[in-house]
UniProtKB/Swiss-Prot annotation:
GO BP, sorted A to Z: cell division; protein import
GO cellular component terms given for this protein: periplasmic space
SUPFAM superfamilies: TolB, N-terminal domain (SSF52964), Tricorn protease N-terminal domain (SSF69304)
Protein name stated in the entry: Tol-Pal system protein TolB
Family: Belongs to the TolB family.
One protein family per Pfam: TolB_N
Chief location bin: periplasm
Keyword Lyase: no
Length: 449
């Protein structure tokens, strides 16, 4: 079945194309008053022209979106130190800040940008007046142990925003012990009825910047899903008059059709090791879940009842799948063990639960929960069963979890059209990424890149 295709009506952009002007704009809709205060001081820059990217602004925005940090507004900063030696520790601790990022940017003779930056423990710096001592070779010497890290990087202008996300990742990991997910991407489908090719598959940085068009079609595109290496996207296309599953290499443009069984082919999802796809087929009647070995093309049926079973998602250990089924009358989320086929129901609160995903640590189930207030994202503790509704947006669907489990992106309705929205895993931070030129659906968060 491995067959190279000319897409016909589906136009593949063999070299990834930048979309003119940012098509997604992140708008904060709910704050994080209880998050940890942190100071991201504007970096010093003495060049004749403006920096290509405001590094400190990108870092502050990243940390705020995580829901764990509350960056101090620049207007409320008591000073703007450009290195550790200039910090007035008392002034910052009086503001309630315990950690501060400071830095500077210069330009070398090659036109590259040299970034020096430090993350400082303000409380420890205050206690030691920035002059603590430590034993070294049996002698007390001055120590800078209040400096959590001190780094230098040389980058080009096109990489500056990317490197700002890298700084955010370093801070996040230093302060939380968890890996940051700011150097990741999202894939999504944009629908614009006025365009010659109204269905477009796009990829952007997680915050909506650097959007690129990778595929466009006159027929619907659905259900993009990333491979674990972040190089391929599985998706559903109706280019031949029915739903079929394809895989696209977003770097080379190479793609192939994987399934074209009678009736429905949908909901592809890569296994954690990237060797299989979980898919949904209706070739025997109702919707059933299968796994497809990508090397041998062996198809294995997982569910076998008369109900409709769909939206498979792999447990992080790769040994089971969760899925949505109407076997109880209305959609609820179940789990099936791939070794013996045993199945158990996971959701009990709410008249419907669907679109389930499990966080990378295996602790929580993120899902669309229907209650009297409508369809909203909810989080269920898989050990205790406790459910927390995370959103108050309208007609939520298609949740996708960041690879570190810290945030969720999803589709909702705003101003009568589909937009992407974002919520931190604890529900404290919320934002919208509305498109300026169409309806946006089916987001998929990439793995770590």
């Amino acid at each position: 079945m491995k067959k190279r295709l000319l897409m016909g009506l589906l136009v593949l952009l063999s070299s990834v194309t930048n979309v003119a002007n940012a098509a997604l704009e992140l708008i904060i809709t709910d704050g994080i008053d209880s998050a940890r205060p942190i100071a991201i001081v504007p970096f010093k820059w003495q060049g004749t022209k403006a920096l290509p990217v405001d590094i400190s602004s990108v870092v502050a925005s990243d940390l705020q979106r995580s829901g764990k940090f509350s960056p101090v507004p620049t207007s409320k900063m008591p000073q703007t130190p450009y290195n550790e030696s200039e910090i007035n520790f008392d002034a910052w601790t009086n503001l309630g800040v315990d950690t501060l990022l400071t830095g500077s940017v210069t330009q070398n003779e090659k036109g590259e940008y040299v970034i020096n930056y430090q993350l400082v423990d303000v409380v420890r710096g205050q206690l030691t007046s920035g002059q603590s001592r430590a034993l070294e070779d049996g002698q007390l010497v001055l120590s800078k142990d209040h400096v959590l890290f001190n780094k230098v990087a040389t980058i080009t202008a096109p990489r500056m925003r990317e490197y700002a996300h890298r700084i955010s990742d370093l801070i996040y990991e230093q302060l939380t012990g968890e890996r940051g997910a700011f150097l990741t991407r999202i894939a999504y489908v944009v629908v614009n009825d006025k365009d010659k090719f109204p269905y477009q598959l796009r990829v952007a940085d997680y915050d909506g910047f650097n959007e690129r068009l990778v595929l466009r079609s006159k027929q619907p595109l659905m259900s993009p899903a990333w491979s674990p290496d972040g190089r391929r996207l599985a998706y559903v296309s109706f280019q031949n008059g029915q739903a079929e599953i394809f895989v696209l290499n977003i770097y080379t443009g190479e793609h192939e059709k994987l399934t074209s069984f009678p009736r429905h082919n949908g909901a592809p999802r890569f296994s954690p090791d990237g060797k299989k796809l979980a898919i949904v087929l209706s070739k025997t009647g109702s919707l059933q879940i299968y796994t497809l070995d990508l090397q041998t093309r062996q198809l294995t049926q997982i569910t076998r009842d008369r109900s409709n079973n769909t939206e498979p998602f792999w447990h992080p250990d790769g040994k089971s799948l969760i899925f949505t089924s109407d076997r109880g009358g209305k959609p609820q989320i179940y789990r099936v063990n791939l070794s013996d086929g045993s199945t158990s129901r996971l959701t009990w609160q709410g008249s419907q639960n669907l679109g389930g995903q499990i966080t990378p640590d295996g602790r929580f189930l993120i899902m669309v929960n229907r209650s009297d207030s409508g369809f909203n994202l909810a989080k269920q503790d898989l050990e205790t069963g406790a459910v927390q509704v995370l959103t108050k947006t309208l007609l939520d669907e298609s949740p996708s979890i960041a690879p570190n489990g810290g945030m969720v992106i999803y589709s909702s309705i705003y101003d009568k059209k589909n937009v992407l929205s974002m919520v931190s895993i604890d529900g404290r931070f919320k934002a919208r990424l509305p498109a300026t030129n169409g309806r946006v659906r089916a987001p998929a968060w990439s793995p770590f890149l």
